[in-house]
């Protein structure tokens, strides 16, 4: 269910914001270390000179300039104040609102924290005391005030055209009742009611002032990143402002900053440069450089632990034996994309998927066998290609997308056949293979085309890694193979999440869940297969090959970029997808076929909201023909 926060009164403004602020109490989810002396102090788009003390509480300062000679106490709200050099004290419960009127004027509206702004002036409180008493102290005749029947309609707020008069009349209205100059300004000025101020406010001037103050604030918030919300804010919006107004980028973060923070920082810098309207080629190049740095840092975070533990491959089969690895593919039906770094690193992921064979056979297969010569032979049955590798340099050329043997090269490297991954040191690949006892022949077979959305690339990588683990005596279990597949995809710079490999490594239908952090090892909750296998439902599922393929890398890069930037709509969508996966889990657990089908349809809608290219016209033309026949459908992946 939802929650309701009321912002109707000054007290509710503060209490509601305090409640919203305290929704999250888990310090692990709050990246910054706040230094507010009291939690009920809120400052936004403001230039604030005085320092807060333990005595300050229930303070709201927004779109305002508060100078060094101001004194705030408790229960103060300050809004709209332009730059000034006033000496001003706000007693407990006193508030100031300055509203731009017309092209060059302002309405000066002091009020009390608990003022209700309704009732006849003879019987209403203003600035925390009876209005009649306030007026008498200043020599004001109640009967001379227009709209005296109701404080909201009473014309008591002066309109001024300079900040000097504004400060003087404020002092007079707030506390210095004998200040003759203040009274003179009030009497000579045109005066408006609270109702009229709301109707006549120049919102463009108000927003312009807020923008200027925010542009001053942003560099300070960035500089104070350890104690501010900067890197937890919507960095897409912040970067847009940096670019639009040509704000200088903050200083580089220190190496001591967390890896995730440094990664978000690099992507923020990239986006800010992309948004610069006058940056030209130089900004474009800088944007690419920062984006590459962000993905490099992400790779570092995901691979450091796996690369720290080096391997010592040892031949574990006889000369006439073959290691045969086979794997199903996977279809995700809810929660896909929530397994993708950096989102899953920050919030964890939930995915419901199922492992499937085609025509009763695992469609991905790998054969590894010894060969007499000290080299590595790579073959692909389905592509009709082969390659012989004789040097470390040839083996390390694995990070080219589209290369037919990128996956086995990277897998062999991770298995310890490149120096950086091996415990022992050799002068050449030939020397290492002679010490190993033989050369290696790796043969691949994929009965499913790449780009089908069934996790083919990830699961082929898992199959190769699993076969090499058995062949080389590495002893990797399924969890380790899944994690090393994630590492392998980072080495190939294709990116991607963990659901593909675990979807096929682990059998059947299941909910996979991870917690936040770089250690993405999913917990598995298996589901009954009745809705897919019982005769009543078996024929109700169809896997249809459209013949339309897409490489995941370009799609991933754009979505991951928005994840790094905490882009509001995307994060909201991903959180909904996480919750949706739990709904799907519940529907399958309850054997509710109709609900499951409709939830598959919802998954399809969610995927389209996340990636507009998910449903190209050719696919939409196909699905329109079956809309009235299906509870739900989706493209896998």
Segments from the language model and where they lie:
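Catalytic-loop motifs flanking and including active-site residues across diverse enzymes
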Residues: 12, 403-410, 456, 460-464, ...
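DPxDG-like acidic metal-binding loop motif
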Residues: 452-474
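Short pre-catalytic strand/loop immediately N-terminal to key active-site residues, enriched for Gly-Thr
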Residues: 448-452, 631-633
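Contiguous, small/hydrophobic- and glycine-enriched helical/loop subdomains that border
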Residues: 470-488
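C-terminal nucleotide
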Residues: 175-179, 183-434, 483-493, 501-635
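Left-handed beta-helix
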Residues: 1-278
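Glycine/charged-rich beta-loop-alpha catalytic/anionic-binding loops adjacent to active sites
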Residues: 389-396, 438-450
């Amino acid at each position: 269910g939802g929650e309701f926060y009321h912002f109707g009164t000054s007290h509710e403004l503060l209490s509601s914001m305090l409640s919203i602020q305290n929704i999250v109490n888990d310090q692990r989810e709050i990246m910054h270390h706040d230094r507010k002396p009291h939690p009920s102090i809120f400052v936004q788009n403001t230039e604030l000179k005085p320092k807060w003390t333990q005595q300050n509480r229930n303070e709201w300062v927004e779109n305002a300039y508060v100078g060094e000679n101001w004194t705030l106490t408790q229960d103060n709200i300050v809004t709209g104040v332009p730059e000034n050099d006033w000496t001003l004290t706000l007693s407990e419960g006193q508030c100031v609102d300055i509203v731009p009127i017309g092209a060059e004027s302002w309405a000066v509206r002091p009020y009390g924290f608990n003022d209700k702004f309704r009732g006849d002036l003879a019987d209403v409180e203003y600035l925390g005391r009876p209005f009649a008493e306030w007026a008498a102290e200043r020599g004001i005749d109640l009967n001379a005030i227009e709209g005296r029947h109701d404080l909201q309609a009473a014309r008591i707020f002066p309109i001024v055209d300079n900040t000097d008069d504004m400060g003087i009349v404020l002092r007079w209205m707030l506390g210095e009742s004998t200040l003759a100059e203040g009274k003179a300004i009030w009497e000579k000025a045109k005066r408006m009611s609270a109702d009229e101020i709301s109707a006549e406010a120049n919102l463009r001037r108000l927003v312009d002032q807020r923008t200027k103050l925010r542009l001053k604030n942003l560099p300070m918030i960035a500089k104070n990143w350890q104690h501010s919300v900067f890197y937890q804010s919507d960095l897409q919006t912040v970067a847009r402002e940096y670019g639009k107004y040509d704000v200088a980028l903050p200083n580089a973060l220190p190496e001591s900053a967390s890896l995730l923070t440094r990664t978000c920082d690099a992507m923020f810098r990239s986006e800010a440069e992309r948004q610069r309207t006058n940056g030209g080629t130089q900004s474009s190049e800088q944007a690419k450089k920062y984006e590459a740095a962000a993905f490099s840092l992400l790779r570092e975070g995901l691979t450091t632990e796996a690369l720290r533990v080096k391997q010592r491959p040892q031949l574990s089969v006889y000369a006439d034996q073959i290691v045969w690895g086979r794997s199903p593919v996977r279809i995700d039906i809810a929660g896909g994309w929530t397994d993708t770094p950096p989102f899953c690193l920050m919030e964890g992921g939930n995915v419901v998927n199922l492992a499937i064979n085609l025509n009763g056979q695992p469609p991905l297969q790998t054969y590894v066998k010894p060969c007499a010569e000290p080299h590595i032979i790579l073959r692909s049955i389905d592509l009709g290609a082969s390659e012989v590798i004789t040097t470390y340099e040839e083996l390390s050329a694995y990070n080219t997308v589209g290369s037919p043997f990128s996956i086995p090269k990277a897998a062999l490297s991770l298995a310890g056949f490149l120096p950086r991954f091996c415990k022992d040191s050799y002068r050449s690949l030939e020397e290492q293979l002679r010490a190993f006892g033989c050369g290696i022949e790796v043969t691949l077979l994929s009965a499913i085309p790449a780009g089908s959305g069934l996790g083919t690339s990830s699961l082929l990588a898992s199959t190769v890694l699993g076969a090499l683990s058995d062949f080389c005596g590495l002893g990797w279990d399924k969890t380790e193979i899944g994690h090393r597949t994630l590492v392998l995809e980072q080495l190939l710079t294709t990116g991607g999440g963990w659901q593909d490999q675990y979807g096929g490594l682990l059998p059947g239908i299941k909910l996979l869940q991870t917690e936040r952090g770089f250690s993405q090892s999913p917990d598995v909750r298996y589901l009954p297969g009745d809705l897919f296998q019982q005769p009543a439902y078996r024929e109700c599922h169809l896997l249809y090959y459209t013949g339309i393929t897409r490489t995941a890398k370009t799609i991933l890069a754009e979505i991951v970029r928005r994840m790094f930037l905490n882009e509001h709509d995307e994060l909201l969508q991903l959180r909904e997808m996480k919750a949706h996966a739990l709904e799907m889990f519940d529907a399958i657990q309850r054997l509710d076929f109709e609900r499951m089908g409709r939830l598959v349809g919802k998954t399809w809608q969610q995927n389209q909201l996340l990636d507009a290219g998910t449903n190209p016209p050719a696919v939409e033309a196909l699905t329109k023909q079956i809309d009235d026949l299906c509870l739900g459908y989706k493209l896998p992946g």
